Curated annotation (Swiss-Prot):
Organism of provenance: Pan troglodytes (Chimpanzee)
Membrane-spanning residues: 515-540
Protein name (database record): Endogenous retrovirus group FC1 Env polyprotein
Lineage start: Eukaryota, Metazoa, Chordata, Craniata, Vertebrata
Family, as annotated: Belongs to the gamma type-C retroviral envelope protein family. HERV class-I F(c)1 env subfamily.
Pfam family, any one: TLV_coat
SUPFAM superfamilies attached to this UniProt entry: Virus ectodomain
Function: Retroviral envelope proteins mediate receptor recognition and membrane fusion during early infection. Endogenous envelope proteins may have kept, lost or modified their original function during evolution. This endogenous envelope protein has lost its original fusogenic properties.
Assembly: The surface (SU) and transmembrane (TM) proteins form a heterodimer. SU and TM are attached by noncovalent interactions or by a labile interchain disulfide bond.
Topology Cytoplasmic: residue spans: 541-584
Sites carrying sugar chains: N69, N247, N272, N276, N308, N313, N322, N334, N342, N346, N478
């Protein structure tokens, strides 16, 4: 069984009669009020913003409290912390409302009102606490008054790691919007339709079936003869209806995008060539078209020519000159389709296999269980790849550390060449990435402008989109010129890196010659040796003096140890005088 791609075409709607929606779908309003919780924090030198959670009000309005459920804050790590939120709108002290708002969120003092995370292991939202946690995986942030108009314009708060911290680590923004509720099935179908359109555009660039294919819009593809997955599946749906299949309410028609879209099905008898058929251009119509083989019938029902008579139940016995296939039929000869067959008896083509066939879309009918098992395969564990080149670099570094001159030179040259190649690849990848991002931003800007114009038309009686939402109007500032300038700079750098390797120029001086590459690795060892030779005499002289001094002291101690110094008369007189002074 062929494995379908994830872009399975859920087009059984063309097979089934219109489904009458239930009362719940009819009574449910298509629009709803939705709260958004955004967190903004600084990571290094980059400012990041992420949507932590969303929650919808009741279908008939925001008349009761709502609660956000989310796993964690991005700027506060779970564990050694107690997240605390401070809002400006609910402060009671003037210092908290009027000062330190930009840096501290209105809370540099202990008397400001803070919403500290409270432990709630029962996971029951309490009215008395704004921020709670189950202590393990989930935080609960409650909005007690969702009907207040402040949420429409947006409320900003500061996030602290601890209640005693002086400065916040992130910023929270809560706002309320009126959105259109799209069922999940329709949302999935919209995503699949976008993917199908993208696949059709890729295929149309490869299939040159129209001289002006780039100028044909998506709606005119069927008339222009371009390939379309939608048209293909519609033909398959018609065949299913003609076959009389019933009870297909939970089945899916799928096609594999990696396989040919059409398959040739052998017909049980020859074409009727007596009638007048529409003239078709001569020559090969298509190549490499697979042939369907019925596993229950080992032989083909009918063949015009065959290399082996056992392959076919019946073989054509008439003349094979100037045969034309009617509308919807083709001659299949060795994976090639043609509308005309002209084979003589002595022609080598008479020994090939030629069949009357009809083209059928290559679709597969899956049940819901089969599709779930095919679209969601089991996860595979990733295996680590052993990188031997890393070991080679480590060995080379070891040789350099050991002082092997040849190894050091080879490592230096190979590392320089590898660094140059990687730098060129990085610049080329950066240029391509910037160009791709610029194209995406320009496309998004065009789509946003079209949506803005459509919204202004729909809300013209209410003063436009901005007046209807009560917000300031935002406009897109096109700064694509900066990106284009950066791309030109990267291109110049890339050309400069390529130029020395293709057209070397050694006229700049002796330091730019190839000999410099061989001399540089020897400079450091030579300098170290010269330094050692300069200080070696001083070191040797110092060591010699110290050895002599130690030897002299040792000899004196050994020779004069049995002797002691005798007292003299002067010494005796000095002792007597000292005793007299002490007696006084």
């Amino acid at each position: 069984m062929a494995r379908p791609s994830p872009l399975c075409l859920l087009l059984l709607l063309t097979l089934l009669p219109p489904i009458v929606p239930s009362n719940s779908l009819l009574t449910e309003p298509p629009f709803r009020w939705r709260f958004y919780l955004h967190e903004t924090w600084t990571q290094g030198n980059r400012l990041s913003t992420v949507t932590l959670a969303t929650v919808d009000c009741q279908p008939h309005g925001c008349q009761a409290q709502v609660t956000f459920n989310f796993t964690s804050f991005k700027s506060v790590l779970r564990g050694w912390s107690n997240p605390t939120i401070g809002f400006v709108y609910d402060q009671t002290h003037s210092n908290c409302r009027d000062y330190w708002v930009d840096t501290n969120g209105g809370c540099p003092y202990a008397y400001c009102r803070m919403h500290v995370t409270q432990l709630d292991t029962a996971k029951k939202v309490q009215h008395t606490y704004r921020l709670t946690s189950d202590g393990r995986t989930t935080y609960f942030l409650t909005i007690p008054d969702p009907w207040d108009s402040r949420w429409v314009s947006g409320v900003t708060g500061r996030l602290y790691r601890w209640p005693t911290d002086s400065y916040p680590v992130g910023k929270l923004r809560i706002f309320l919007t009126y959105i259109r509720v799209i069922p999940q099935v329709l949302s999935n179908l919209q995503d699949q339709a976008d993917n199908i359109k993208h696949q059709e555009e890729v295929i149309n660039t490869l299939v040159q079936s129209h001289p002006k294919a780039d100028m044909v819009t998506y709606d005119d593809k069927a008339e222009a003869g371009l390939f379309s997955w939608i048209t293909l599946v519609r033909h398959g749906a018609r065949l299913v209806n003609m076959a009389g299949l019933v009870n297909l309410s939970h089945c899916f028609l799928c096609t594999a995008l990696s396989q040919p879209p059409l398959v040739a099905v052998p017909l049980p008898q020859a074409f009727n060539t007596s009638g007048n058929h529409t003239a078709h251009p001569s020559g090969v119509f298509s190549e490499q078209v697979p042939l369907f083989r019925d596993p229950l019938q080992p032989q083909f029902p009918f063949c015009y020519t065959t290399p082996n008579s056992s392959w076919c139940n019946q073989t054509y016995s008439g003349s094979l000159s100037n045969l034309s296939a009617p509308a919807g039929g083709y001659f299949w000869c060795n994976f090639t389709l043609t509308k005309h067959l002209n084979i003589s008896s002595n022609n080598t083509l008479s020994r090939n296999l030629c069949l009357p066939i009809s083209l059928v879309p290559r679709l597969t009918l899956y049940s819901e269980a089969e599709l779930s098992s095919l679209v969601n395969p089991p996860m595979r564990q990733k295996r680590a790849v052993f990188p031997p080149l890393v070991i080679g670099v480590s060995l080379t570094s070891s040789l350099v550390a050991s002082g092997l001159g040849t190894g050091a030179i080879v490592h230096f040259i190979s590392s320089s060449q590898d660094l140059s190649i990687k730098l060129q690849m990085a610049i080329e990848a950066s240029a391509e990435s910037l160009a791709s991002l610029q194209r995406q931003i320009t496309s998004v800007a065009k789509v946003a402008m079209q949506n803005r114009r459509a919204l202004d038309l729909l809300t013209a009686d209410k003063g436009g989109t901005c007046m209807f939402l009560g917000e300031e109007c935002c406009y897109y500032i096109n700064e694509s010129g900066l990106v284009e300038t950066s791309l030109l700079t990267l291109d110049k750098i890339r050309d400069g890196l390529h130029r020395p390797s293709s057209t070397p120029n050694y006229g700049g001086g002796w330091w730019q010659s190839p000999l410099t590459t061989w001399i540089i690795p020897f400079i450091s060892p030579i300098l170290i040796i010269c330094l050692l030779l300069l200080i070696a005499p001083c070191v040797l002289k110092f060591i010699k003096n110290r050895i002599s001094e130690v030897s002299r002291v040792t000899v004196n101690q050994m020779l004069l140890h049995p002797y002691s110094r005798l007292p003299t008369s002067e010494d005796h007189y000095d002792v007597a005088l000292t005793q007299q002074e002490a007696a006084r």
